From Swiss-Prot:
A GO MF label: tRNA binding
Protein name stated in the entry: Small ribosomal subunit protein uS13
Gene Ontology process terms (BP): translation
Entry keyword annotation includes Transmembrane: no
Family in the record: Belongs to the universal ribosomal protein uS13 family.
Quaternary structure and partners: Part of the 30S ribosomal subunit. Forms a loose heterodimer with protein S19. Forms two bridges to the 50S subunit in the 70S ribosome.
PROSITE patterns assigned: RIBOSOMAL_S13_1, RIBOSOMAL_S13_2
A single Gene Ontology CC term: small ribosomal subunit
Keyword Transcription among UniProt keywords: no
């Protein structure tokens, strides 16, 4: 296993798929990274030389990934809550934030049904 950005990246997978195991790197960004360092996206990580691995590390260092990205997201949500915005209120109440209906559906966000005893 190769360690990139604090994550053990699987070396038996294609470069794009392996890079997607890093939080904050999706398919399109992984393809962009492979293209910029000149690696075929179907090359397995284990077959890459140390030079290309270092190039990959340097390219990924340009982006906000892993712990920094998680911290940034939680701070953004905390800021919304502290400001008292509508979105912050929805986050605090564990309800959908982006205008989805809540009379029916929204079970993932609201959690399991609460039983009402009559």
């Amino acid at each position: 296993m190769v360690r990139i950005a604090g994550v053990n990246v699987p070396d038996r997978k294609h470069a794009v798929i392996a890079l997607m195991s890093i939080y904050g790197i999706g398919r399109s960004r992984a393809k962009l990274i492979c293209l910029s360092i000149g690696v075929d996206e179907y090359t397995k990580i284990g077959q890459l030389s140390d030079v290309y691995i270092d190039k990959m590390r340097n390219e990924i260092a340009k982006y906000v990934v892993e712990g920094d990205l998680r911290r940034e997201v939680t701070l953004n949500i905390k800021r919304l809550i502290d400001l008292g915005t509508y979105r912050g209120l929805r986050h605090r109440r564990n309800l959908p934030v982006r205008g989805q209906r809540t009379r029916t559906n929204a079970r993932t966000r609201k959690g399991p049904k609460k039983l009402i005893n009559k």
